[in-house]
A protein has these predicted regions:
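Switch/coupling segment of Walker-type NTPase motor domains
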Residues: 2-8, 30-115
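The Walker A (P-loop) glycine that initiates the GxxxxGKT/S ATP-binding motif of P-loop NTPases
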Residues: 17, 134
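Conserved ATP-driven motor cores of ASCE-family P-loop NTPases powering translocation/secretion/packaging/pilus
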Residues: 19-21, 31-32, 54-59, 80, ...
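Hydrophobic positions on the alpha1 helix immediately C-terminal to the Walker A/P-loop
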Residues: 26
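Loop/turn-to-beta-strand initiation segments
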Residues: 38-42, 94-97, 123-129, 164-169
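Conserved H-loop
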Residues: 46, 133, 166, 173-174
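Conserved ATPase-coupling elements of RecA-like P-loop NTPase cores
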Residues: 53-54, 105-111, 124, 136-152, ...
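Substrate-engagement module of ASCE P-loop NTPases
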Residues: 116-125, 150-169, 211
Length: 221
């Protein structure tokens, strides 16, 4: 695994790649590095993919000190109405957390997330790495009806959150459907296999904002 330099960790990061490309494996490796260094991490996990961080690699002993809220491996069960209270709690307390939204309907997940992100932004004042797995769920490009408030909450954290301690990592298998105003705020982008031309164009657009047009075209091929 390629190790990120320290400067890259102090920035917003996008990790992009199709299903099976290894993006989640790589992202977990980077998050493990953060936890080893004592950084505070909060993970929004729509698919219950991250709970294993609390176990060791063999699965027979303790791993990292991280609390799982929600999902089938929950330390603390949650429902769609818990978003604001949990956001306030994690904004006040130095707790590492995985928030599994698996088992919620899509509308329930969106309602939970919008209130959680609003409360976390309002209360938090300390450094925290906010990991958005399947980030296009929280910042959709399409402007899907009913997601306006959620997109606004995500966009506000990404654009304005650095002064309040936020470092946001966005993980997505479809950068084409991840909101471009949010994606362009990433300072570091890690792109893995992306066979769809629309997804490669999204990468090219990001690179154009960071480099010259010739470099962007070469990198997106």
């Amino acid at each position: 695994m390629i190790h990120l330099p320290p400067a890259a960790l102090e920035a917003h990061v996008a990790i992009l790649g199709k299903t099976g490309s290894g993006k989640t494996y790589r992202a977990k490796g980077y998050v493990e590095d953060l936890l080893r260094e004592g950084r505070r991490v909060v993970i929004l996990d729509p698919t219950d993919a991250w709970w294993g961080l609390r176990s060791n690699a063999a699965g027979d002993g303790p791993g990292f000190p991280i609390t799982v809220f929600g999902g089938s491996h929950a330390d603390v069960p949650i429902n769609e109405h818990a978003g604001e209270a949990l956001g306030e709690l994690l904004g006040r307390e130095p707790i590492n957390a995985i928030i599994s939204l698996d088992g919620m309907g899509r509308g329930e997940m969106h309602r939970f997330a919008e209130r959680f992100l609003e409360a976390l932004y309002r209360v938090n004042q300390q450094p925290v790495y906010l990991i958005l797995d399947e980030a296009d769920e929280f910042a959709p490009q399409s402007g899907e009806r009913g997601t306006e408030r959620l997109l606004g909450a995500t966009d506000r954290i990404v654009r304005r959150g650095r002064k309040k301690g936020f470092r946001v990592w966005m993980i997505s298998q479809r950068p084409a459907v991840l909101n471009k105003n949010v994606l362009t705020q990433a300072n570091t982008l890690i792109a893995m296999r992306l066979p769809a031309s629309q997804d490669r164009k999204a990468i090219e657009a990001w690179i154009k904002g960071q480099a010259d047009e010739a470099q962007a075209g070469r990198a997106a091929r």
